[in-house]
Amino acid sequence: MATVTQELDPAAAHVLTSAFPAFVKNVGTNFPVPALAYDATTDEAAFWSFIATSYGAGNVTVRVYWYADTATTGNVVWEAQLAAITPNSDSQDIETKAFATLNFVQDTHLGTTGQRLHSADITVSNLDSIAAGDHVTLRLARDANSTSATDDMAGDAYVVKVVVTYSDS
């Protein structure tokens, strides 16, 4: 039993025409930090697509690597949804495919440093009948209006990497 890993970069994200995180490149002291800037007051979402290479069974884990722009306290809520299509089998229109019900995690800022890197794991159990070889679209959103849980961290939350993992058996 092995774990399959899909790494998703901020620059590869796709967005709709509204309610999306801005792509930013923060110029650090020693290297640039590309990120998606999720707003604190408006729900925003970004999308990535990948092939479910060697998917076996079980839940999918979405690990969000993020940091706060300025805040040193508070909670941020991340939501993940999947939409899976089996090529040459499903008759679903790829442009109108619906997402499975979302899963979420509430992560607490660990304090003291505004731009401290955090990671939060979302266990995705609503899998949209994912199978090996499926074309999968991931929706990652910040729940700024606290529909799923309380998101009270002030300012932007910057996503620097998303890692999707699942079992091959």
Model-derived features with residue positions:
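Proprotein-processing/basic-patch segments
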Residues: 141-169
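N-terminal leader/pro-regions and domain N-caps
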Residues: 1-41
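A short beta-strand element within beta-rich, extracytoplasmic domains
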Residues: 58-68, 76
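Short coil-to-beta strand junction motifs in C2/discoidin
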Residues: 72-80, 154-159
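Extended low-complexity, serine/threonine- and proline-enriched intrinsically disordered segments
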Residues: 76-91, 162
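Cysteine-clustered segments with highest specificity for TGF-beta superfamily mature ligands
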Residues: 116-148
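Short beta-strands within extracellular/lumenal beta-sheet-rich domains
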Residues: 39-57
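Extracellular carbohydrate recognition and processing domains
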Residues: 90-128
